[in-house]
Amino acid sequence: MKILIPTAKEMNTDHPCIEALPLKEESQAVLDSLAHYSASELETFYKVSAEKAEEEYAHIQALKDHRAKHYPALKLFDGLMYRHIKRDKLTETEQAYLEDHVLITSALYGIVPALSPMAPHRLDFLMKLKVAGKTLKSHWKSAYDEALRGEEVIFSLLSSEFETVFSKEIREKMVTFKFMEDKAGQLKIHSTISKKARGAFLTALIERKVQTVEQARKLSFAGFDYRPDLSSDLELVFVKQA
């Protein structure tokens, strides 16, 4: 059983560094493509300010020259979802569950265990980077599929641009989750609520060592309860009263 979570744009490097691992072949190819861009080209590529582009250029060059500082991925990323995941003061069994089941999907590193070393970088599957003539999605498809080959239960907390990297065969196994708010009888989906809920849901999975869809259906967390009337076999819907 594996749980997939995406990367985030926000990062926090206020953590102790850890030792880097050698880059996979696929990751090196992506890095080589990124390293061709000048700082001013990155400004256009990332659609960011000149100052931000300079920062990203420095990150890419540091990775290329093996100077980059690395951090556990789950602690490096600091978006809204990540800030709602229990990342510190885990019990031994919670830590073991996290290490065994939670995977981060990255457009640079591939699919890796949540505490794998990562260096600060900015890349997602909506970016139009060509790697040896292929799109990022095409470049990663077989490695992404291979990482989940043989897994029967796959919980996806990914957005659609990450899910579509996988083949149909893998996607058909994925259990997805929807988090909604009930405002006076009106069900609403809100990006902020969804991101916070994904983090709180993952925390509940970790704390209760969930292994099956049946166990996931029984969860109540952060005001959310499972709604069987809105759910299907492969999409579980949780609703919170506003």
Predicted segments, located by residue:
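Active-site helix-to-loop segments that bind/position phosphate- or nucleotide-bearing substrates
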Residues: 2-89
